[in-house]
Amino acid sequence: MVQEELSLFRITTGYFFLLWYIIILVAAYSGFFEILFNFRNRPILHTKQQANHQNDPESDDEEIYEGVTIIRPIKGIDPELTSCLESSFCQNYPRSKLQILFCVDDPNDPSIPIIQKLIAKYPTVDAQILTSESYNSQTKTSDDHYGPNPKVNNLAKGFVHAKYDILWVMDSNVWASSNILKNSVISLNGNLNMSRKMGQSRPVKLVHHVPLALSINNTTRSDDFIGGQDLEITAMTPVPSSESLNSQLVKRKSSPKSNNSLNVHPGFTYSKFSKKLGAELDEMFLHTSHSKFYVSLNNLAVAPCVNGKSNIYRRSDLDQSVRLIPHKDSPFFKDPKVKQDAGYYTSLGVGHAIKFFARYIGEDNMIGIALWENTQGRTGLTGDVVVQPYSGSENNAVKDYIQRRVRWLRVRKYMVLLATLIEPTTESIICGIYGTYAISTVFFGTWFNKYWFVMHMLIWMLTDYVQYHTLINHTLDVKNITYLPNWLNESIPPKQRNCLQWGYIWILRELLALPIWIIAMIGHEIDWRGRPFRIKKDLTAEEM
């Protein structure tokens, strides 16, 4: 009786959506369990040489580890800029093998005094500021202009001046714990992904780290300097961790408890709440939906999935990947002008290949594709995260969150169209709707079993809750690190929210996912740092 009521269309669509439902759940939960088991604590990787020579670790480090150049492009002052930049100086890595280049376009950029203080504070580290040539303060342009992407234009001088082949390109607004560089070099040279050995058919050529954002208590520019001064007093008094004789933990002044969390207090106003809600939505997105699929897709390795917040690769590999573009057929680099420019920039010498990517807004994705296609490489994770602090001062209202998501979805629409088109099916509500339809049709002979949908949403929400707090606790973990800034402590807003407050932000994030995607799909203009762009058919960007 039930089977007679089901049309061929219902049966076909039911099985189709059931298959897709299973695929999405497998992808989601493979990422979830990877995070649950391997992101619980900060990882510490060791080479075979270290394991055999633990009595003299510093001497071994000098011999084992290659030199690394850290390149940090900077424009203006972001929240907690001092501590984010200082994390580069505090890497648990031989200082004789470290170079830090701060790339600044404007010689009068307000960030320069902060950088100068850090360089003076760490005189044994090879660090310098590189500014663009012939910068015009009226037009805000310089001779270092190779395309519409201002980040790549700024980075280019760092690639040319780097004295080491291994490069760590890291945005100025993210903080990294002190073992990330060591873990990454071991992973890059050891062909490791999540500490697991990969096959030689597609070795690890780019190491990246899961990007997170944290909604923190309001700070001012002076607070940023104060944080650095506090650390200057205490950073030289490390204490050994209970977990490792080779690890150190910086003592620090405890931060005062904030009154700006979501807890309602006498000074609470809607404007304060709404101004910070965008930061909390970003935090929720990156700690839940984005991170689980980011980790899952990286492990699946069917295509590069790279966020450019923190990437480590060899300059020689990037040069080689661009050098081969004119000689290979690729749907991403097929335009004759693109091939011509690839040949031109690589002919200029070592390090100039990065200039080729200034034509793309999503340079991180295109670098990943070039390394994937032309060096037969893949990406690898270390089990580390990098954290971008968001204050509640400005540019963090709901509309700002929506604009950020729309902007990058539009970029991805042109870079990876298929993945962008199916993205809504990975969100909890849409996934629950077609999944419930499939389960109801195939197993219950009904249109929509509401009990299954409710169960689906509750399990998904519980999964995200566990994953969210696993990553939060990872970020706050004080074991085996040498530097933890004042804004990373138990009084941060994520640790102060109760379940209802967390659930409110989670529900709002899930409800906004589909409208944001629709807005991104029907529009073409991309607003980036106040400048409008459009993406052309060859994936390059054009300033409007």
UniProtKB/Swiss-Prot annotation:
Motif D1 per record, residues: 109
Catalytic reaction list: an N-acylsphing-4-enine + UDP-alpha-D-glucose = a beta-D-glucosyl-(1<->1')-N-acylsphing-4-enine + UDP + H(+)
| Record-annotated active site | 364
Q: Which GO terms describe its biological process?
A: filamentous growth; glucosylceramide biosynthetic process
Pfam families, alphabetized: Glyco_transf_21 (PF13506)
The membrane-spanning stretches of this chain are 16-36, 428-448, 452-472, 502-522
What compartments host this protein? Golgi apparatus membrane
Q: In which pathway does it act?
A: Lipid metabolism; sphingolipid metabolism
**Could you say which EC number(s) this protein's record lists?**
2.4.1.80
Q: Which family does it belong to?
A: Belongs to the glycosyltransferase 2 family.
By its UniProt entry, which InterPro entries does this protein fall under? Answer: Ceramide_glucosylTrfase, Nucleotide-diphossugar_trans
Q: Report motif location: (Q/R)XXRW.
A: 404-408
Q: Which residues lie on this side of the membrane: Lumenal?
A: 1-15, 449-451, 523-544
- Which keywords are on file for this protein? Glycosyltransferase, Golgi apparatus, Lipid metabolism, Membrane, Sphingolipid metabolism, Transferase, Transmembrane, Transmembrane helix
* Identification of the protein by name: Ceramide glucosyltransferase
Domain comment, in the record's words?
The D1, D2, D3, (Q/R)XXRW motif is a critical part of the GCS active site, involved in catalysis and UDP-sugar binding.
What's one GO MF term for it?
ceramide glucosyltransferase activity
UniProt organism field: Candida albicans (strain SC5314 / ATCC MYA-2876) (Yeast)
Deletion phenotype, per the entry, is: Results in complete loss of glucosylceramides (GluCers) in mutant cells. Has a decreased hyphal growth rate and increased susceptibility to SDS and fluconazole, suggesting defects in the cell membrane structure. Shows increased resistance to plant defensin RsAFP2, and to heliomicin, a defensin-like peptide from the insect Heliothis virescens.
> One Gene Ontology cellular component annotation?
membrane
